[in-house]
Amino acid sequence: MLNPDSPQYFKDLSEQLVRYTLKVLKRLDKSEGVDGKYATFINMNTVLQNPNQDGRKLVTRFGQLKGETDAEQKENADIASWFINEYYAERSKVYENSSGIRAQVSKVIANRYLRGILNPDFDKGQRNQIDFDEHLEKGGVICICTAQGMMRDLGKFLGYFIILQLQSAVFRRPGNEDNRRAHFLYIDEFQTYSTPGFSDMLTQGRSYRVASHLATQARAQIAMGGGRDGKNFVELVSTNARNLI
């Protein structure tokens, strides 16, 4: 995760880089009618690091895809051009100024536990076994341990990743408040995974029938992951809490 107090330019650049990378990988998957063959952290690292020009090869293949619409076709061409002419260019400032996100992704695939969990081997028939969209529709119980004692800061990253995945699934739920199945999210040691980005879940989650139960040692600790916005985030958590125990 980038420091919340990083200059806005670096945060915007990193967000753009990640967004473009994900579109490259997910649309390569879609072009072959599969899910998870290209869209893995290993391939994400390949696009970001470009070892032996392998990232450029993936981007070039992506640029040759036929979009489902004219708008998508143009976006594909624009993204491929951005990578080839700006990101992969010799002595690229864009590449230089996005070192933070590359370092974070490298840490993930360097850890043997996360490498196995987050990168199912498509060719061996391995697939992602957690589908939050299906879970929200049909119900059930999912328990996830981030192994803080074993992985330390990478356990925190795993927590961020899982929460963001769930949050995305929540906000694309079909239906309305009357026909969505109710769900309950429990996060222990919330201060470990708290970021201002979770605020949408607190302010809008109830509309999607997802209630959050957050456990922390002290509310002041929640601000630790929020940078300058930390105090405001603590206030937002308190304001949106129905019960404080």
What is each of the regions a protein language model found here?
Residues 202-245:
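Conserved ATP-driven motor cores of ASCE-family P-loop NTPases powering translocation/secretion/packaging/pilus
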